[in-house]
Design a protein with these regions (language model features):
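Reductase modules of NAD(P)H-dependent flavoproteins
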Residues: 22-107, 256-364
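Short, surface-exposed secondary-structure boundary micro-motifs
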Residues: 75-78, 112-114, 165, 215
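Ferredoxin-reductase
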Residues: 121-209, 226-227, 263-265, 290-294
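Short, conserved phosphate/pyrophosphate- and ester-handling motifs at nucleotide-, phospho-/glycolipid
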Residues: 157, 237, 326
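A short, basic/flexible loop-to-alpha-helix module at the beginning of a structural domain
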Residues: 215-225
Length: 364
C-alpha cells in the first residue's frame, strides 16, 4: 500500500499553468472587406498560405515580400512579420503583405479578389529537359517535357518553381499558352552570381531531370474582358506576355492588343521576329520595341518603356494592362498608369526579382 498524499493548490488570477503538449495553436479569422468572404488562419501560416489552402483568391507574385503584388489594405487587426519584407515600406501606411504576414488577431483586409479555378491543381512533377536554346548572350529558352501522357493545366501568365536539391526554389514564368502544352517553355536570363542560372547556361544537358511545382501565381489573362489591352514587358518579362498574347489570339479576342517590349539594346530583343509575325497575321495587334540604351543604327522608340506607352495613350482609363519585368520598371509603370487614369482593377503585373544564391529569392 502506498500512503495517500493530499496536495492542495492555491490558484489566483495571476497564476498560469501550461504544458507545451497541452497548448493549443491559436487561430484567427480573416475577413475580406466588400465581399465579406472569410477564412481561418493558423498562427504559423501566412495570410496568403491560409487563403490558398481554402481556395480564396488573393493576388500574389513573388511570394518573398519583394514585388508588392499581394499588397492589401489592413482595415483592422494586427499583422506580424519575420523580418522586414522589402516591399512593405513601398506599399505605404495602412497596408500589409499577405505573402509574408502572420495574423496576430482577427483581421479585416481590403484586396481585389481573383478567380481561383479549383479544377487546376498545383502539383509536384518531374520534368525532363527537351531542349536548351541559347537565344542571345544572356537568355536561353528551355523546353521541358512532362512524363508520358501528362499535361500541365495552367492559365496564361502563371509560373512554376524549380525545387532544388538543397531545398531552395527558383521561379520562372511559363512562356507558352495553355493550348500549346506539348512542352513547358521558359525564358531564362543569366544572373551574375546565380548558381542555378550558371548551371543552366553552362552545364544543363538535354534529358536532365528536374522537379517542379506548378502552376503558381495570379498574373493571368482575363479572357472575358472586351477592353483594349496593353502588354508592357521588360527583358524576360516578355515570357508570360507571350503566353497571354498567344492565348488571346487563340480565343479570338478582337479588341486592340498592343505590345511594348523594353530592353537596353537591340540584341536584348531575344525573339524579335515573333511579335513581327504576330503583327503580320493579326490586324488588331501592334508591336513597339523600346530601347533604353539604343544602338547607333536604331531608328525606333527610345527611353523607358512606360513612357512610350503614355506618349501613345495619355488616357488609360479604358484599357487593361498586363505588365511584367524588373521591380523598378513595374513600380514606375504602375505609378504612371494609375496617374493616367487606369483603374487598379484593370492592372495586372508580375514583378521579377533576381536572386543571388545567398538567399531564397527567385532567379526569375
Amino acid at each position: 500500500m502506498y500512503p495517500t498524499v493530499l496536495i492542495t493548490f492555491e490558484i489566483n488570477e495571476n497564476c498560469k499553468v501550461s504544458h507545451p503538449k497541452l497548448q493549443e495553436t491559436m487561430s484567427f479569422t480573416v475577413t475580406i472587406d466588400g465581399s465579406g468572404h472569410q477564412f481561418d488562419i493558423e498562427e504559423n501560416e501566412t495570410v496568403l498560405d491560409a487563403a490558398l489552402r481554402q481556395n480564396v483568391g488573393l493576388p500574389y507574385g513573388c511570394r518573398n515580400g519583394r514585388c508588392g503584388a499581394c499588397a492589401a489594405g489592413l482595415l483592422s487587426g494586427e499583422v506580424s512579420y519575420h523580418g522586414a519584407p522589402p516591399a512593405l515600406q513601398e506599399v505605404g501606411a495602412g497596408k500589409c503583405l499577405p505573402c509574408q504576414g502572420f495574423a496576430a488577431s482577427d483581421l479585416v483586409i481590403s484586396v481585389r479578389e481573383v478567380e481561383t479555378p479549383e479544377e487546376i491543381e498545383v502539383k509536384l512533377l518531374p520534368v525532363r529537359v527537351h531542349a536548351v536554346d541559347h537565344l542571345t548572350h544572356d537568355v536561353v529558352r528551355l523546353k521541358l517535357k512532362l512524363p508520358e501522357n501528362q499535361r500541365l493545366q495552367f492559365r496564361a501568365g502563371q509560373y512554376l518553381d524549380f525545387l532544388l536539391a538543397d531545398g531552395r526554389r527558383r521561379a520562372f514564368s511559363i512562356a507558352n499558352a495553355p493550348f500549346d502544352d506539348e512542352f513547358i517553355e521558359l525564358h531564362i536570363r543569366h544572373v551574375d552570381g546565380g548558381k542555378f542560372t550558371d548551371w543552366v547556361f553552362n552545364q544543363m544537358k538535354e534529358r536532365s531531370i528536374l522537379r517542379i511545382q506548378a502552376p503558381l501565381g495570379t498574373f493571368v489573362l482575363e479572357e472575358d474582358s472586351e477592353r483594349p489591352m496593353i502588354f508592357m514587358g521588360g527583358g524576360t518579362g516578355f515570357a508570360p506576355l507571350k503566353g497571354q498574347i498567344e492565348q488571346a489570339f487563340r480565343s479570338q479576342m478582337a479588341q486592340p492588343i498592343h505590345l511594348y517590349w523594353g530592353v537596353r539594346a537591340q540584341r536584348d530583343l531575344y525573339l524579335p521576329e515573333l511579335p513581327k509575325q504576330w503583327a503580320r497575321e493579326h490586324a488588331n495587334f501592334t508591336f513597339v520595341p523600346v530601347l533604353s540604351e539604343p544602338d547607333a543604327d536604331w531608328h525606333g522608340r527610345i527611353g523607358f518603356v512606360h513612357e512610350a506607352v503614355l506618349a501613345d495613350f495619355p488616357d488609360l482609363s479604358g484599357f487593361d494592362l498586363y505588365m511584367a519585368g524588373p521591380p523598378p520598371m513595374v513600380k514606375a509603370g504602375r505609378e504612371a498608369c494609375l496617374a493616367a487614369g487606369m483603374p487598379e482593377a484593370h492592372m495586372h503585373f508580375d514583378s521579377f526579382d533576381y536572386a543571388d544564391d545567398s538567399g531564397a529569392n527567385p532567379d526569375t
